[in-house]
Design a protein with these regions (language model features):
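ABC ATPase C-loop
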Residues: 159-160
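Conserved ABC ATPase signature
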Residues: 142-146, 150
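Conserved ABC ATPase "signature" region
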Residues: 71, 120-137
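Conserved ABC transporter NBD signature motif
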Residues: 63-71
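ABC ATPase NBD coupling module
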Residues: 72-89, 193
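Catalytic Walker B motif of ABC-type/P-loop ATPase nucleotide-binding domains
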Residues: 167-170
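Q-loop/switch helix immediately C-terminal to the Walker
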Residues: 101-112
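Helix-to-loop junction immediately C-terminal to a conserved catalytic motif
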Residues: 55
Length: 225
């Protein structure tokens, strides 16, 4: 599902005499359907950068990123958007949504973009919001008014609303209470069971042991940069 070959990324600082900061180099790994792989390494080693490269938020300097056969490197915007609509989900650490959009619609949006009927999409959204213990009286409010923990759970619900074949997870259990943490781990296991390929960042070692099949130490790629 994921196939990454000879991937490189260097940031160029245009406002500092074109200074170059190598981030990752010679990145090579695969992730199969039904497998969850954790990216590990110290802060600043390039874990989040790798996720953003795979999602197409950053342009790669060189290499190949295949997601279900689509090469993200060099893909045009339309191809990237289609990949995100039907194949590749991304649960980030921070919720980014338009103001005043109700929470239930925020969670349902990936399903609507994939062509799901409104009633079915909102039913799925209600199920996930209840599962993640978001009080029902908040569902019609914008999640931008919520606490940090509530926003994180809305973000997780949104990321798991559509059954993506591939998922990127950036600290999905950070700052969650024990009950919600376990719920999210169960959701990850369920996604694996249906064949989803997952790449994640988990600073929670117990969570890594629970859901991840193996680990990739990103510092090896950073050291070669």
């Amino acid at each position: 599902m994921f196939e990454i070959r000879n991937l490189e990324k260097t940031f160029r600082l245009h406002n500092q005499n074109q200074a170059e900061i190598p981030v990752v180099s010679n990145v090579n790994f695969n992730v199969q359907a039904g497998e969850c792989v954790a990216l590990t390494g110290a802060s600043g080693s390039g874990k989040s950068t790798l996720l953003r490269l795979i999602y197409g938020n950053y342009l790669a300097g060189d290499g190949t990123i295949l997601v279900d056969g689509t090469n993200v490197v060099g893909a045009d915007p339309r191809t990237i958007l289609e990949l995100r609509r039907t194949t590749l989900g991304y649960v980030t650490q921070f919720l980014r949504v338009l103001p005043r959009v109700p929470t239930i619609r925020v969670v349902a949006e990936p399903l609507l973009q994939a062509g799901c009927e409104v009633d079915a999409a909102e039913e799925r959204a209600r199920y996930l919001l209840e599962k993640l213990r978001i009080p029902e009286n908040l569902w019609e409010l914008s999640p931008l008014t919520f606490s940090g923990g509530e926003q994180q759970r809305v973000n997780i619900a949104r990321g798991f609303a559509y059954d993506y074949p591939a998922l990127l997870l950036d600290e999905p259990t950070a700052s969650l209470d024990p009950a919600n943490r376990q719920t999210v781990l169960d959701m990850i296991i369920d996604a694996k069971d249906r064949g989803c390929a997952i790449i994640g960042i988990f600073h929670d070692e117990a969570a890594r042991r629970t859901v991840c099949d193996r680990e990739i130490d990103v510092t090896h790629f950073a050291a070669a940069a």
